[in-house]
């Protein structure tokens, strides 16, 4: 039996609206409760991010790490890596989640060669697979870290150096093999350094062609080895590069269509990345779902006062409600999607239990958002609003426009003699402030029950 790492923490339970002083517990996330015919746990499919939860030391550009973790006593890199697996699976069991996500380099230290690195990684993956057999834990997605090591200083697939491209492809090959071993439901590509610092010395077309080339290689090899995962691209506009090629959902979808990737790839969308691109999280989810390309979600939030990616645990109920309304409209997050907490505690929240507290607020916030979104959907509130707003397209000239019967000549004949007073009279106030007030009341009323 392994040692207990998270001492003093019992399995987190649904406690409802009890006083928070009663201890750790979920107020809104009740995994077995049915919402619109589906269990909450199946709507949300929560996952824990290995990197932020078990590897993140809470460093910032101005100070060393503050994190206190129960496995800090291990100094040998491989001993530490194996101890983290024990701690991680205890954490999953106590938190009550079914999924994890990881980069290859989250799990094990690198060696001098890729062969040595793969051997280290395989030892840790062996242990994860054994835990999966006894715990039932599943992998929502895995991926390759091709941005941290100095060899990726100018990108991986988009590097100007062929040796780096070759190394990246070899690393990716092994990561796909690991994905098959652990039964990963998705495989994510986040191009951490797939972009440029300056256009003056950049062949942008060649770099994007190389990125598409490695994505096709990945899908081809996954098919070859029987790794049936949904491939996902994750947009982010900047940081660490000045400009990244997968800027936002719309840009990434255009890239996918340009290079014939949209049949095999979907999108993994993150809240903080949406903010950096100048969008709301809801906007990015809407763009993806209406294109039929919503794959999975990373759950976190940014700060409008801070211009970088802070990966804060989500707590804004208005934002989680908006995100979950898009999910409810879609019928699910995606064919195999989930909500991965790509989030970390603040540097001042350094105690081990803060990892539980952060996940609890995130899980409760999205569960609350689901409850409110379902209430609005079941009442038909927003559906009725939109149906009324666009009702002019149900008959007359509007119906002709919708059906394709109208053309420029027929529309000119219809509009050319209409006085401005008649056109203005056809418009109506949308009472947007009332809509926002009503949404506020849905949040307050639904969550007070």
Swiss-Prot record:
<keyword id="KW-0963">Cytoplasm</keyword>
<dbReference type="InterPro" id="IPR001998">
    <property type="entry name" value="Xylose_isomerase"/>
</dbReference>
<feature type="active site">
    <location>
        <position position="106"/>
    </location>
</feature>
<dbReference type="GO" id="GO:0000287">
    <property type="term" value="F:magnesium ion binding"/>
</dbReference>
<keyword id="KW-0413">Isomerase</keyword>
<dbReference type="GO" id="GO:0042732">
    <property type="term" value="P:D-xylose metabolic process"/>
</dbReference>
<feature type="binding site">
    <location>
        <position position="298"/>
    </location>
    <ligand>
        <name>Mg(2+) 1</name>
    </ligand>
</feature>
<protein>
    <recommendedName>
        <fullName>Xylose isomerase</fullName>
        <ecNumber>5.3.1.5</ecNumber>
    </recommendedName>
</protein>
<keyword id="KW-0460">Magnesium</keyword>
<dbReference type="GO" id="GO:0005737">
    <property type="term" value="C:cytoplasm"/>
</dbReference>
<dbReference type="GO" id="GO:0009045">
    <property type="term" value="F:xylose isomerase activity"/>
</dbReference>
<keyword id="KW-0119">Carbohydrate metabolism</keyword>
<comment type="subunit">
    <text>Homotetramer.</text>
</comment>
<feature type="binding site">
    <location>
        <position position="342"/>
    </location>
    <ligand>
        <name>Mg(2+) 1</name>
    </ligand>
</feature>
<feature type="binding site">
    <location>
        <position position="270"/>
    </location>
    <ligand>
        <name>Mg(2+) 2</name>
    </ligand>
</feature>
<feature type="binding site">
    <location>
        <position position="273"/>
    </location>
    <ligand>
        <name>Mg(2+) 2</name>
    </ligand>
</feature>
<feature type="active site">
    <location>
        <position position="103"/>
    </location>
</feature>
<feature type="binding site">
    <location>
        <position position="309"/>
    </location>
    <ligand>
        <name>Mg(2+) 2</name>
    </ligand>
</feature>
<keyword id="KW-0479">Metal-binding</keyword>
<comment type="similarity">
    <text>Belongs to the xylose isomerase family.</text>
</comment>
<feature type="binding site">
    <location>
        <position position="311"/>
    </location>
    <ligand>
        <name>Mg(2+) 2</name>
    </ligand>
</feature>
<dbReference type="InterPro" id="IPR013452">
    <property type="entry name" value="Xylose_isom_bac"/>
</dbReference>
<feature type="binding site">
    <location>
        <position position="234"/>
    </location>
    <ligand>
        <name>Mg(2+) 1</name>
    </ligand>
</feature>
<dbReference type="InterPro" id="IPR036237">
    <property type="entry name" value="Xyl_isomerase-like_sf"/>
</dbReference>
<keyword id="KW-0859">Xylose metabolism</keyword>
<feature type="binding site">
    <location>
        <position position="270"/>
    </location>
    <ligand>
        <name>Mg(2+) 1</name>
    </ligand>
</feature>
């Amino acid at each position: 039996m392994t040692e207990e790492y998270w001492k003093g923490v019992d399995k987190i339970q649904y406690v409802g609206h009890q006083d928070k002083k009663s201890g750790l517990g979920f107020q809104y996330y009740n995994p077995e409760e049915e919402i619109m015919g589906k269990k909450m746990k199946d709507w949300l499919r929560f996952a824990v991010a290995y990197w932020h939860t078990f590897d993140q030391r809470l460093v910032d550009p101005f100070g060393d790490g503050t994190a206190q973790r129960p496995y800090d006593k291990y100094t040998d890199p491989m001993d530490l890596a194996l101890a983290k697996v024990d701690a991680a699976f205890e954490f999953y069991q106590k938190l009550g989640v079914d999924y994890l996500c990881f980069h290859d380099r989250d799990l094990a230290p690198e060696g001098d060669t890729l062969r040595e690195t793969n051997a280290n990684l395989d030892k840790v993956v062996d242990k994860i697979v054994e835990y999966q057999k006894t715990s039932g834990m599943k992998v929502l997605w895995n991926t390759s870290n091709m941005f941290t090591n100095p060899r990726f200083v100018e990108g991986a697939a988009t590097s100007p150096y062929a040796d780096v491209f070759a190394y990246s492809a070899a690393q990716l090959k092994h990561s796909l093999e690991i994905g098959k071993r652990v039964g990963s439901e998705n495989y994510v590509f986040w191009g951490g350094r797939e972009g440029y610092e300056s256009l003056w010395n950049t062949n942008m077309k060649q770099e994007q062609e190389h990125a598409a080339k490695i994505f096709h290689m990945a899908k081809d090899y996954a098919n070859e080895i029987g790794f049936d995962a949904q491939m996902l691209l994750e947009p982010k506009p900047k940081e660490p590069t000045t400009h990244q090629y997968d800027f936002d959902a719309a840009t990434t979808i255009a890239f996918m269509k340009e290079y014939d990737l949209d049949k095999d790839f979907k999108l993994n969308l993150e809240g903080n990345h949406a903010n950096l691109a100048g969008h709301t999280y809801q906007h990015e989810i809407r763009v993806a779902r209406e294109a039929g390309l919503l794959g999975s979600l990373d759950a976190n939030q940014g700060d409008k006062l801070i211009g970088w990616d802070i990966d804060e645990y989500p707590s804004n109920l208005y934002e989680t409600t908006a995100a979950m309304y898009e999910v409810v409209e879609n019928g699910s997050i995606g064919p195999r999607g989930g909500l991965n907490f790509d989030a970390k505690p603040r540097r001042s929240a350094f105690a081990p239990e803060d990892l539980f507290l952060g996940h609890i607020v995130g899980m409760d916030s999205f569960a609350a958002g689901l409850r409110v979104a379902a209430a609005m959907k079941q009442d038909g509130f927003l559906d009725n609003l939109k149906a009324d707003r666009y009702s002019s397209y149900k008959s007359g000239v509007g119906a002709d426009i919708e059906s394709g019967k109208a053309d420029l000549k027929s529309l000119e004949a219809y509009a050319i003699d209409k006085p401005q007073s008649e056109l203005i009279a056809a418009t109506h106030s949308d009472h947007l402030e009332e809509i926002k007030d009503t949404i506020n009341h849905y949040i307050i009323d639904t969550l007070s029950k």
